[in-house]
């Protein structure tokens, strides 16, 4: 792995745990030359995802209801249409670099499902996908305890962990 290549760490908040979950927020951090150089955050209109056939799960909705109101309110502020959110994320991704999720079968897979649901091209290649959780498990690393469920805050914590690992 080229340590200086672009790396995009992404985190989502969703209304399901399925691979085709409805997205309500996208947070991402861009790393270049082992430094955080940019961030991305957008709330997403969940109704658009549902109309596109993305999954909403009762258990996840119930779980969200148990979270503090300010957490739920955060991703309901100024939601963008799903189409706009994905186009904005594609622009942020920039067409090259690895894309890192915290779990091999969650964030990146769900984003890909959303792109497909709208008939959009996925901006990365399958070989660009990397899993931070797997890397952390191999190295016996743990993320600091947090419970904010904010996609950008979580992506930032994950990016900082990735940098810690890459710099060691």
Where are these regions (language model features)?
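Conserved non-catalytic scaffold segment of RNase H-like nuclease domains
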Residues: 3-8, 13-101
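Substrate-recognition/cap helix-loop segment adjacent to the acidic, metal-dependent catalytic center
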Residues: 90, 105-126
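Non-transmembrane alpha-helical segments in soluble domains
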Residues: 72-73, 90, 112, 159, ...
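Acidic active-site catalytic centers that drive phospho-/nucleotidyl reactions
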Residues: 11-13, 107, 131, 154
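Short, flexible loop segments at boundaries between secondary-structure elements
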Residues: 123-142
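Short, function-defining helix-loop hinge/capping sites that tune catalysis or transport
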Residues: 19-21, 115, 162
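Hydrophobic positions within alpha-helical membrane elements
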Residues: 16-18, 136, 159
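Acidic, Mg2+-coordinating catalytic module of metal-dependent nucleases/exonucleases
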Residues: 98-105, 109-110, 140-168
